[in-house]
Amino acid sequence: MAITTDPSITSKSANCRGGDAIELSCIGEDGARYNARMYTPQAGIFALGTSSHTYLEFDILDVKKSKEFASTISAIREPRTTTGGVNFVIGFRPELWRDIVPEDAPPGVAGFNKEIQGKEGFVMPGTQHDALVWLSGSAYDVIFDMARSIVHDLAGQASLGEETASWSYQHDRDLTGFVDGSENPTLLDAPAAALLPEGFPGAAGSVLLLQKWKHKTTEWEALPIDQQERIMGRTKPDSIELENKPADSHVARTDQDEFGHIFRRNMPYGRVDDHGTMFVGFSADQKRLSGMLDSMAGLINGTRDALTRFTQPLTGSYYFVPSVETLRRLR
């Protein structure tokens, strides 16, 4: 049913269950009038152009105090660009979120609670934590100070299970030298791919997959460029998809036309002798993300992603990233 708003009725900020969502009076094609609430996604999801990042993953010390923890972490700062130039994205283990705010939990979403055992002994580990705070901005000193403040604020309620700093490399390339995110939707289209729609539990929220992939750089750089391109399924200089890409190429194994579109915010991480890619993928449907992982591991049709022979997943967690209004409600 197509929806049109009634121009004679003014939108208002409703102090209603679910937070300060915008409530619109709407008229359907059948003439029926009803109210529809609109929620706001965390702006950090779409804050492109940031060069410095830190991912803080936390484990709750006392599960009986999970609501207190959620209140503290949600009050760290508004989940939008701050005056200090830091963007925040706050996410929760899906099962934890369901316990805290069941009415805002999308059905069927689960944590990365067990490893994925792929073909030829390939394994993607599940290292699920309880919560994530992802900070991004233009200057790492501000990110560093804010990260220290967050860890301090949560001390006594949660331990820091994983911390990773990352940074942009040659504008939009990862450490393989290839452009990362060529299939990303534009910012106009990204919300449709990343956010749960209005009218559903978790509206304006997103399912986030966070993985740390270590690169086998010496082996990778020993390959000729044309072989690297066949493994990726794209040309290296200009990221053009190969017309006759191999079935085990990375592009073929993660075809978004097959699994559904996601919004990626990947970034390089690490030191000179130990580095790789932080995979940061947002989706309105967890099945798009899990399907891609199964395909990469060779569980869809027996064909393993060739890129996984030159990269190694070290971590894996799913988080539900709720709307701004729902976070406010927890404070």
PLM feature spans:
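Ser/Thr-rich, low-complexity intrinsically disordered segments
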Residues: M1-S13, A32
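A residue-level detector for conformationally permissive "hinge/kink" positions
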Residues: T10-S11, E23, P268
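Short, positively charged and aromatic/hydrophobic N-terminal segments
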Residues: A21-I22, I27, R33-Y34
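Long, histidine/aromatic-enriched segments associated with O2/redox biology
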Residues: Y34-R331
